[in-house]
Each structure stands twice: as structure tokens, then as C-alpha cells.
Amino acid sequence: MSQSIYVQGGAGLLHARQYGAIRTAQVPLIVMHGVTGHAGLWHHVATALSQNRAVIALDMRGHGLSDWCAQQDYATPAHVQDLACLLEALGQPQYDLAGLSWGGLVSLQYAACYPERVRRLAVLDVEPSFTQSEHEVMARPANFPSRAAVMEYERKANPQAPQSLLQLFAYESVNQVDLNLWQRRHDPYFLRRWPFRNDDVWAQLEELRCPTLLLHGERSFVRLAIMQEMHDRLRHPAGLYELPDTGHLLPLEAPEPVAAYLEEFLTAD
């Protein structure tokens, strides 16, 4: 089970799902999704990991139940500021971070900026820099005639996802605005622009002081060779692991292996 929490971010209210209670003896884990995603992506992983710690899954600004930014300030540093707001509100001295795709870039940059606040970091399926511009966005439908159509779309994109998790993810990805009209639950801005394409975090990657785990999906468009180079440049590498027959959305298509890798990493000596 999870409960919704809201905190004030840099441009409005931020929504997050908290799984499990914060315990004095256990560092909380913060998990973050990627562009056009939402906190529900992590539901199965967070449920599994919350047996031993609190897990908080954040809806990034402009996504899920978090407020949209009126100024459309969606650059990665703005999300780092939001993450700082969430962690300050939670009031713990240290955190573990795990982020998929854009969430991985946000988590990495936070860890580089606030090394004393991050105990361990996991970065899932992302490259540190990009050749594409922020306007080169993969086409995707903005609207659907039914939730069944959303499910059909997400099943094609994520063929290995467990049915129950895929349904949760798909249904929470849209809002019903008319009898036969469902719209994506994120700012339409992200159908046109992906501002993280301006990021280059190689230098920050090399500055990380915490143990860092990397996970890659075998079917992902993210290049394994680039993630291997990331691993080679880390000060404190904790391994690079590829999940077989898994696409870009690792927590959605392979929640059990992701949870297992994270549990082992977070409890290592």
C-alpha cells in the first residue's frame, strides 16, 4: 500500500507516493521516473523494497499529480531543485536515490550537488549527453478514445510488463476529459520538447562520491557501450547489469529483477 504526500516545490505542489514508514535505522529510497512517466511506474519495485525501508516515488513537475509549471521551466536543474524541496520536507539526513532515464539524470545531478545527502545512487537506462535536440521528440498520441486503447498502446511498447502493473501504469497515465476522450496526465509540452536533451553530465558523473549502480535494458535504445563508459568513469562503481529482453522502462517490464538488484545494492556493506 502507498499514501499520497504533497510538498511545495519550486513551481507548485509536488505529489509523491510513499510506500512504508520512514524508519530511523533505514535510509529512505527516493525513486524517479522519466519523461511523460509518473510515480506509478515504480509501484511493484517500491512495494517490494518497502519491506525494509520507506520508498518515495515522486511525480516530477508537469507529470502525474504534480502541478504543471506555468512558465514551462522544465530544465533538469528545476527538477533537481524540486527533489531538494522533497528531501528537505521529508527531513532525513541522508537518502538513497534511484532514477530511470530523465529521473536518473536528476538523481545524478542532485548527488553531485549535495554529496553529503546521498548514500547510494542507482541510474537506470540513460546516457549522460545527447546528439538529438530537445525538439526531436518521439511521436506519441496525446489522446485516446478509451482506457482500453491506452492499455493496447502501452502493451505494444512494453511487451514484458506484468499485466497488473501495466494496467496501473496505463490507467494512471491519463485523465478522462469527455465520454470517449482520455488525455495524457502530463503537460502537453512534453509531446513537443524534451529539455533533458540539453544535458551533459559527464563531468558530474566523475565527481560522484557515492557508490553508483547502473542498470540497462537489453531492448532499450540506450546504448550499452555508453553506459559501460559511464561505469568506467565512476569513482565508486557498483556494477553495470543488463536486464535481458527488457526495454527502456525497466521498473515496468522487469520489476522483480530491478527490485532484486536494488535490494542487494542498498544492503551491501
Regions found by a protein language model. Name each.
Residues 1-29, 51-53, 93, 239, ...:
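Alpha/beta-hydrolase fold catalytic core
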Residues 141, 145-199, 204:
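Conserved alpha/beta-hydrolase catalytic His-Asp/Glu region
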Residues 99, 103, 107:
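Gly/Ala-rich beta-loop-alpha elbow adjacent to hydrolase catalytic centers
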Residues 10, 17, 23, 44-47, ...:
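Active-site loop/oxyanion-hole signature of alpha/beta-hydrolase fold enzymes
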Residues 178-233, 242:
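Conserved serine/cysteine hydrolase catalytic core
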Residues 34-44, 55:
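Serine-hydrolase catalytic-loop signature spanning alpha/beta hydrolases and amidase-signature enzymes
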Residues 246-255:
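Catalytic histidine-centered segment of alpha/beta-hydrolase-like enzymes
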Residues 108-112, 119-148:
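Flexible "cap/lid" loop of the alpha/beta hydrolase fold
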